[in-house]
Amino acid sequence: MRPEAAGVREARGRLCHCPGDDPGRLPLPRGPESSIPAPWRPWMSPPPGDAELTRTERPCESWGDQHTSGSKGAFGFQHPVRLYLPVSKRQEYLQSSGEKVLASFPVQATIHFYNDDSESGSEEEQEEEAQPNHLQCLEAEVRDSAQEERAE
């Protein structure tokens, strides 16, 4: 090893060392009595003494899927969290209210639409059956243009 490299190594040792590297220093306390707070993990329940994050009331059934098994996460919600909105309000959601709902919700969630009126669903199906689909329109255009070419 070159002497210049040894000098760099010594300089690094003096400039950069961890507090735990000093043999004369006591080790940092670890465990529950430590003064350093544990990092917050949203998928885990808050510590029992943390009153800010503890939620005593149950979330509304329509705001989350309460039928899956597992432990409760942040704010007392069970993950995955699903917000249910009626299909009739889908357009309103797409315009503005969905963004507001998700922004005001305290945890990450997905929005699922449900059929709120069985009659409206059957009406939509009847309308779809009455309207020709895109492929049928293209086929009709091709046939029409072929007939026009033959006529000329």
Swiss-Prot record:
The keyword Transcription applies. It comes from the Eukaryota. One of its GO terms (cellular component) is nucleus. Disulfide bonds: none annotated. Disruption phenotype: Mice are viable, fertile and morphologically normal. Show abnormal development of pharyngeal derivatives, including ectopic formation of the thymus and the parathyroid gland, as well as cardiovascular malformation. Keywords: Developmental protein, Nucleus, Repressor, Transcription, Transcription regulation. Residues 1-24, 140-152 have a biased composition (Basic and acidic residues). It is found in: Nucleus. A motif (WRPW motif) lies at residues 40-43. Residues 1-76, 113-152 are annotated as: Disordered. Its main location: nucleus. Residues 116-130 have a biased composition (Acidic residues). GO terms for biological process: cell population proliferation; heart development; negative regulation of cell population proliferation; negative regulation of transcription by RNA polymerase II; pharyngeal system development. The keyword Nucleus applies. Residues 79-114 are annotated as: Ripply homology domain. The Ripply homology domain and the WRPW motif are both necessary for its transcriptional corepressor activity on the transcription activator TBX1. Belongs to the ripply family. This is Protein ripply3. It comes from Mus musculus.
